[in-house]
């Protein structure tokens, strides 16, 4: 579950954020403006400090000129990032650089160029310097990008060991039960914000499966709001501004972090004292040790549980919502997915099992195609620490080195009928099987998302339940545009129409 995307519009985003968080309060606005100015000075000094001489004979990537000091291409990129990158690819090729808010970003587009980022060592292209300031206030100290990369890799390995087939077989009936109970309130027909609904359901199912019944039992409206406040820490402002600023969203994030940690601490202590066997990630973390034999602390366990929930929630809820609109737009495909349920599981549609879920190949391809056209994360980034050579160019230290799954997964050079939603493209030879980094919605290399398989289990189980219960339609033909102002690229106004299937 790759967590985060790229700051897309420096000045515009800050203006929007200031207007929202201050409510027009002059003092608050001035404080934020001062803090932002200090941040700009810091970024400028940082950028200057990163100016290094390239090795003799080395050639820099093509640089897209901007007459606007400091902000550079931030506004143009923020308005239409995909169009900006695709136009740059056509003009400059697979490797190019440009400036935004005082930083230089070098994009690697296409499978061959992207290999540099995904095959890199952390000491050459560093992730902590990019993502640490965002994740640490949300997850806490001692986990993810707050620790040396070797420790983070151990933590990911521990989590991955708990996301296994034996656990998945137990999770499917849990997720199905949660989904059926959730949809009881929908009635026979209506219109719903499907992204909001699926976000709620995915929090419920993920908490039950990963955190265990102790934590799931406490997931009421108050705790759900705490999760929302914590999730509110993943913003462009949080990426740009110091974490200690007294912004309302930062204060809500920090308060939610403390309260959720306290809930987790109590659940951890209760589990340690319990003699009942449990099959969830919480138990996996309690039973695991690092290579040196040290057990995980309660602080580390709670931080990893928060990270698992929020990172997975973003990927699964966004993908699930987008797939709903693709299926609503293509009613014959939606009907094929429903008939697949009967063909694989039985005409009377008995409770789902993991083995049946594996055989829902069309539904699987629909998820895969949704992730191709609407990957949750538009950009994956690293900080260049050493000179890096790719496609005949040398990227100097200090550049933000980026790969865009969204662009790679719709390049004209790689994908036939690239903008069409066609799940059957995966039945033939395609770039996803032939080009190693043409299809990377979950990342690749050492930072590949460890929750990919769980995400598929979760989404397939939820959508199997939804297809069995309802038919879905667009409202007056409306298909959402992409909201590029958020760090996770959600659908705009994602309201969908539904009607219960006749028995």
Curated annotation (Swiss-Prot):
SUPFAM superfamilies: Cytochrome P450. It catalyses: a 14alpha-methyl steroid + 3 reduced [NADPH--hemoprotein reductase] + 3 O2 = a Delta(14) steroid + formate + 3 oxidized [NADPH--hemoprotein reductase] + 4 H2O + 4 H(+); lanosterol + 3 reduced [NADPH--hemoprotein reductase] + 3 O2 = 4,4-dimethyl-5alpha-cholesta-8,14,24-trien-3beta-ol + formate + 3 oxidized [NADPH--hemoprotein reductase] + 4 H2O + 4 H(+); 24,25-dihydrolanosterol + 3 reduced [NADPH--hemoprotein reductase] + 3 O2 = 4,4-dimethyl-8,14-cholestadien-3beta-ol + formate + 3 oxidized [NADPH--hemoprotein reductase] + 4 H2O + 4 H(+); a 14alpha-methyl steroid + reduced [NADPH--hemoprotein reductase] + O2 = a 14alpha-hydroxymethyl steroid + oxidized [NADPH--hemoprotein reductase] + H2O + H(+). Signal peptide: none annotated. One of its GO terms (biological process) is steroid biosynthetic process. It is a single-pass membrane protein. Disruption phenotype: Embryonic lethality at 15 dpc, likely due to heart failure. Mutant mice present complete block of de novo cholesterol synthesis at 14.5 dpc. Heart abnormalities include hypoplasia combined with ventricle septum and epicardial and vasculogenesis defects. Skeletal abnormalities include facial hypoplasia, brachycephaly, and bowed and jointed bones of the extremities with camptodactyly. Can serve as an animal model for studying Antley-Bixler syndrome. Its cofactor is heme. Pathway: Steroid biosynthesis; zymosterol biosynthesis; zymosterol from lanosterol: step 1/6. It comes from the Eukaryota. Inhibited by azalanstat. Inhibited by azole antifungal agents ketoconazole, itraconazole and fluconazole. The chain crosses the membrane at residues 24-44. Its EC number is 1.14.14.154. Keywords: Cholesterol biosynthesis, Cholesterol metabolism, Endoplasmic reticulum, Heme, Iron, Lipid biosynthesis, Lipid metabolism, Membrane, Metal-binding, Microsome, Monooxygenase, Oxidoreductase, Steroid biosynthesis, Steroid metabolism, Sterol biosynthesis, Sterol metabolism, Transmembrane, Transmembrane helix, Ubl conjugation. It is found in: Endoplasmic reticulum membrane; Microsome membrane. One of its GO terms (molecular function) is iron ion binding. Heme binds at residue 449. It holds the Pfam family p450. Ubiquitinated by MARCHF6, leading to proteasomal degradation. Sterol 14alpha-demethylase that plays a critical role in the cholesterol biosynthesis pathway, being cholesterol the major sterol component in mammalian membranes as well as a precursor for bile acid and steroid hormone synthesis. Belongs to the cytochrome P450 family. This is Lanosterol 14-alpha demethylase. The gene is Cyp51a1.
């Amino acid at each position: 579950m790759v967590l985060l995307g790229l700051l897309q519009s420096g000045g515009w985003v800050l203006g929007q954020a200031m207007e929202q968080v201050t409510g027009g309060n002059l003092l608050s606005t001035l404080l934020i403006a001062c803090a932002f100015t200090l941040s700009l000075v810091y970024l400028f000094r940082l950028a200057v400090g990163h100016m290094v001489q390239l090795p003799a004979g080395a050639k820099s990537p093509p640089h897209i000129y901007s007459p606007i000091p400091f902000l550079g291409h931030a506004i143009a990129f923020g308005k239409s990032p995909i169009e900006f990158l695709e136009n740059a690819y056509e003009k400059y090729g697979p490797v190019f650089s440009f400036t935004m808010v005082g930083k230089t970003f070098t994009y690697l587009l296409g499978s061959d160029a992207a290999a540099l980022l995904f095959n890199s060592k952390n000491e050459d292209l560093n992730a902590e310097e990019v993502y640490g300031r965002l994740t640490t206030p949300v997850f806490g100290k001692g986990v993810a990008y707050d620790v040396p990369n070797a420790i983070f890799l151990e933590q990911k390995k521990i989590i991955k060991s708990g996301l296994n087939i034996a656990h998945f077989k137990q999770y499917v009936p849990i997720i199905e039960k949660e989904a059926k109970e959730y949809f009881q309130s929908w009635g026979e027909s209506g219109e719903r914000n499907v992204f909001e609904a699926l976000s709620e359901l995915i929090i419920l199912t993920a908490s039950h499966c990963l955190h265990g019944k102790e934590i799931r039992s406490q997931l009421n409206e108050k705790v759900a709001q705490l999760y929302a406040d914590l999730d509110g820490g993943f913003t462009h402002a949080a990426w740009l501004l110091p974490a200690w600023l007294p912004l309302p969203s930062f204060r809500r994030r920090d308060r939610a972090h403390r309260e959720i940690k306290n809930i987790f601490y109590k659940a951890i202590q209760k589990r340690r004292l319990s003699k009942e066997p449990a099959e969830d990630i919480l138990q996996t973390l309690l039973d695991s040790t690092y290579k040196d034999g040290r057990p995980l602390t309660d602080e580390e366990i709670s931080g990893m549980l928060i990270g698992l929930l929020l990172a997975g929630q973003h990927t699964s809820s966004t993908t699930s919502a987008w797939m709903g609109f693709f299926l609503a737009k293509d009613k014959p495909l939606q009907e094929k997915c429903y008939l697949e349920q009967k063909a694989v599981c039985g005409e009377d549609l008995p409770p789902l099992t993991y083995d049946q879920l594996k055989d829902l190949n069309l539904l699987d391809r629909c998820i895969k195609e949704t992730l191709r056209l609407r990957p949750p994360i538009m950009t994956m980034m690293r900080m260049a620490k050493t000179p890096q050579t790719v496609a005949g160019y040398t990227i100097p230290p200090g550049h933000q080195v980026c790969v865009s799954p969204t662009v790679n997964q719709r390049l004209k050079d790689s994908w036939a009928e690239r903008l069409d939603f066609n799940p059957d493209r995966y039945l033939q030879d395609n770039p996803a099987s032939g080009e190693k980094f043409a299809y990377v919605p979950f990342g690749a290399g050492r930072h590949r998302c460890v929750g990919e398989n769980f995400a598929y289990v979760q989404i397939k189980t939820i959508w199997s339940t939804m297809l069995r219960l309802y038919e879905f339609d667009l409202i007056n033909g409306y298909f959402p545009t992409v909201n590029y102002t958020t760090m996770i690229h959600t659908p705009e106004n994602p309201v969908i129409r539904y009607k219960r299937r006749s028995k």
